């Protein structure tokens, strides 16, 4: 429990019908008595005047007192709900700061105190900021799932499985004289594989949650003059790229940040891929491949007037072979206005095929819908959980150590090394929920929150 008392405006700054001042700490009840002249009953909304040090009324509104530990922060909490004008809010905060022992809250300090007082774990605290920042209904649903503990529950299940397996492995190490070789009886190997599979499932869902929060990186790639720049312009709704009939017009990477129904996308147009002799064009092609390797999804642009093929392996096998295995690919057969092909999306074969005309805009709506679905949008789902880059990094490191442990078990029956790898993997998972986190990490996370949250 902290010993100082903090105050901040909990509602957004600016004019509004209602503005809320939040106070948390051991002096919250004293602040209530000083500002309202009353001893507040816990959990009762009371309509009272808010006065200055001379007893002059500054405002009037509702006062609510929540004694610890049954409050958002786990401390004594006072909320003053007054009129939402910035001058009124500023006068009230200045009045409260006149009380000895009260200071302004740092950004995110209320949520930080809630975390430190075990009112929520770190993923739930982060979900508050994600819910506030949500740019789409789906993102809000995902953030709410995390706030309600869905992500934490998945992590805790993995940690419990790791703990049980560690106990079993360490028992086998500590009692080698037992007639049964516990490491070789198949249970350890089977349980470890189950944990690895479950972790992989959580990683897939976390990747989707991170895309929902941070945006999906989509790279438009293909041969020169396939219509890549025209597609960038069609998706962004403006003439971001120069479009000509001259092959190789785009020589550098062009970026546009767009939203499709509130869902963020980073669209990147790249230089046409070919064997170039021009030094500048070569640099552009190298940069194109750098972007492709970092993409969440590649839109493989094909000039429909040059081939009837729809399978990337048939169209350009060398391109497909150079793609990283984990990157999704969508084939875009462009210039449907010239070929007369039926517009729209085809899911019959893998990868997904979309026929459109970037020049006229026909079929582009089908691509927009497809990109939304790739980001996890579904009108009839409640949404998965929200994830951040640090979550993905921790999950990846945990998976790496489990893989090392599995290799040591299967190759050498090295129980001691397996036990250590399990311990490290568990530590990385605990970083996600904050059960093992450095002060520096906590400071960076909560400093990104709004003041008053």
UniProtKB/Swiss-Prot annotation:
It holds the Pfam family MMR_HSR1. K(+) binds at residues 225, 244, 246, 249. Its main location: cytoplasm. Its cofactor is K(+). It comes from Vibrio cholerae serotype O1 (strain ATCC 39315 / El Tor Inaba N16961). GO terms for cellular component: cytoplasm; cytosol. Homodimer. Heterotetramer of two MnmE and two MnmG subunits. Exhibits a very high intrinsic GTPase hydrolysis rate. Involved in the addition of a carboxymethylaminomethyl (cmnm) group at the wobble position (U34) of certain tRNAs, forming tRNA-cmnm(5)s(2)U34. Keywords: Cytoplasm, GTP-binding, Hydrolase, Magnesium, Metal-binding, Nucleotide-binding, Potassium, tRNA processing. Residues 215-376 form the TrmE-type G domain. This is tRNA modification GTPase MnmE. InterPro entries: G_TrmE, GTP-bd, GTP-bd_TrmE_N, GTPase_MnmE, MnmE_dom2, MnmE_helical, P-loop_NTPase, Small_GTP-bd. The gene is mnmE. Mg(2+) binds at residues 229, 250. It is found in: Cytoplasm. CDD domains: trmE, TrmE_N. GTP binds at residues 225-230, 244-250, 269-272, 334-337. Binds 1 potassium ion per subunit. GO terms for biological process: tRNA methylation; tRNA wobble uridine modification. Its EC number is 3.6.-.-. It comes from the Bacteria. PROSITE patterns: G_TRME. One of its GO terms (molecular function) is metal ion binding. (6S)-5-formyl-5,6,7,8-tetrahydrofolate binds at residues 22, 79, 119, 453.
């Amino acid at each position: 429990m902290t010993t100082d008392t903090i105050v901040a405006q909990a509602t957004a700054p600016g004019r509004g019908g209602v503005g809320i001042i939040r106070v948390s700490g051991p002096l919250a009840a004293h602040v209530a008595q000083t500002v309202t002249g009353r001893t507040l009953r816990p959990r009762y909304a009371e309509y009272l005047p808010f006065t200055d040090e001379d007893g002059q009324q500054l405002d009037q509104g509702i006062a609510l007192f929540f004694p610890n530990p049954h409050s958002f922060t786990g401390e004594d909490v006072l909320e003053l709900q007054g009129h939402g004008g910035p001058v009124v809010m500023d006068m009230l905060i200045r009045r409260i700061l006149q009380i000895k022992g009260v200071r302004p809250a740092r950004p995110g300090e209320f949520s930080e105190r809630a975390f430190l007082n075990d009112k929520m774990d770190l993923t739930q605290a982060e979900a508050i900021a994600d819910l506030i920042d949500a740019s789409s209904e789906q993102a809000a649903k995902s953030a709410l799932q995390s706030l309600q503990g869905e992500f934490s529950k998945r992590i805790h299940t993995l940690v419990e499985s790791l703990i049980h397996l560690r106990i079993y492995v360490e028992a086998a190490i500590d009692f080698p004289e037992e007639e049964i070789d516990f490491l070789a009886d198949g249970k350890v190997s089977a349980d470890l594989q189950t944990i690895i599979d479950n972790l992989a499932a959580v990683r897939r869902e976390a990747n989707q949650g991170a895309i929902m929060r941070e945006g999906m990186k989509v790279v438009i790639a293909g041969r020169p003059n396939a219509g890549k720049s025209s597609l960038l312009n069609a998706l962004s709704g403006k003439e971001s790229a120069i479009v000509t009939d001259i092959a190789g017009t785009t020589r550098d990477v062009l970026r546009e940040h767009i939203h499709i129904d509130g869902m963020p996308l980073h669209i990147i147009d790249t230089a046409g891929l070919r064997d170039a002799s021009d030094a500048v064009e070569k640099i552009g092609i190298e940069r194109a491949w750098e972007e492709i390797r970092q993409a969440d999804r590649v839109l493989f642009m094909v000039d429909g007037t040059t081939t009837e093929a729809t399978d990337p392996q048939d169209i350009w096998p060398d391109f497909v072979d150079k793609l990283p295995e984990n990157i999704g690919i969508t084939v875009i057969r462009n210039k449907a206005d010239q070929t007369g092909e039926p517009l729209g999306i085809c899911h019959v074969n893998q990868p997904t095929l979309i026929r459109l005309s970037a020049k006229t805009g026909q079929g582009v709506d089908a691509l927009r819908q497809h990109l939304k679905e790739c980001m996890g949008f579904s009108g009839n789902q409640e949404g998965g959980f929200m994830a951040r880059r640090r979550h993905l990094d921790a999950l990846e490191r945990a998976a790496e150590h489990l893989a090392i442990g599995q290799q040591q078990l299967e190759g050498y029956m090295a129980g001691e090394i397996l036990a250590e790898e399990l311990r490290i993997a568990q530590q990385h998972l605990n970083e996600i929920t904050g059960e093992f986190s450095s002060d520096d990490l906590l400071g960076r996370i909560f400093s990104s929150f709004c003041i008053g949250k």
